Regions:
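Cationic, amphipathic, low-complexity segments that mediate targeting or membrane/lipid association
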Residues: 2-4
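Nucleotidyltransferase catalytic core that binds NTPs
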Residues: 22-23, 27-230
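Short, positively charged and aromatic/hydrophobic N-terminal segments
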Residues: 6, 11-23
Length: 230
């Protein structure tokens, strides 16, 4: 009797596994531009490609971008790349939280199809063709005023990633609202045929906007940060 139950359970398990692999193919991970481009070039032109660039240390806010992309697009691409050119302090770059193993599992669970996880900085910047963009006060006020050069670094890396992935739609969280406007403006100025979409802020139970850097805050700092939502 136990053997029969085991066999029955195994058959059901095998059927389920086959179903998952057929209808829910595993996420593909690429570490080089070349391999990623080759894969994306094999996708039918009529399929809509969505893209969500991240710096990793993923949370529910990032995953909401993947799910929104899944709703609107046929293929969902995500990148994890901690971009050094947008950090003002070396220590901030070096201490940025990283957990690629967990990030990969989270992306799989959210339904991501393709992950670009470059080996190093040169893998992203190797073919850069620098473009001078003047966006005026949009990049000089608020965060731009307190972090000189930050948005230049953001635009550089996002343009590179757009050039590599060639998405139809790109998804960004509205938590970084100024950054969203900068990227949207950049795409328009450069005549990129990419629809830059903003997605709603995802918050913790206490109302604080989810952020990868939240884990670096002390309990007191987390409490003080709640004033930002008022």
């Amino acid at each position: 009797m136990r053997v029969q139950k085991y066999i029955k359970k195994s058959i059901i398990s095998n059927i389920y596994t086959s179903f998952v692999h057929h209808f829910c193919p595993m996420m593909k991970i690429f570490k080089t531009q070349r391999a990623l481009k080759e894969h994306l070039s094999s996708i039918e032109e009529k399929l809509v490609v969505g893209f969500a660039p991240t710096m990793g240390s993923l949370h529910e806010g990032h995953l909401s971008l993947i799910r929104e992309s899944k709703k609107r697009c046929d293929i969902v691409v995500c990148s994890i790349f901690v971009n050094p050119t947008q950090f003002n302090a070396v220590s901030d770059f070096e201490n940025y939280p990283k957990d690629y193993v967990e990030d990969i599992e989270l992306l799989k669970s959210a339904g991501c199809d393709v992950l670009f996880l470059p080996n190093d900085v040169d893998e992203v910047y190797q073919n850069e063709k620098k473009v001078s963009l003047e966006l005026g006060n949009l990049v000089n006020v608020l965060e731009g005023e307190h972090r000189p050069g930050h948005f230049d670094g953001v635009m550089r890396v996002v343009k590179l990633l757009f050039d590599i992935v060639q998405p139809d739609k790109a998804f960004f969280g509205l938590k970084d609202f100024q950054q969203f406007l900068v990227i949207q403006k950049m795409a328009k100025v450069l005549n990129m045929e990419i629809e830059v979409l903003g997605c709603d802020i995802v918050r913790e139970e206490n109302g604080l906007a989810m952020s990868s850097r939240n884990k670096r805050l002390s309990n007191t700092e987390l409490k003080n940060a709640l004033v930002l939502q008022k």
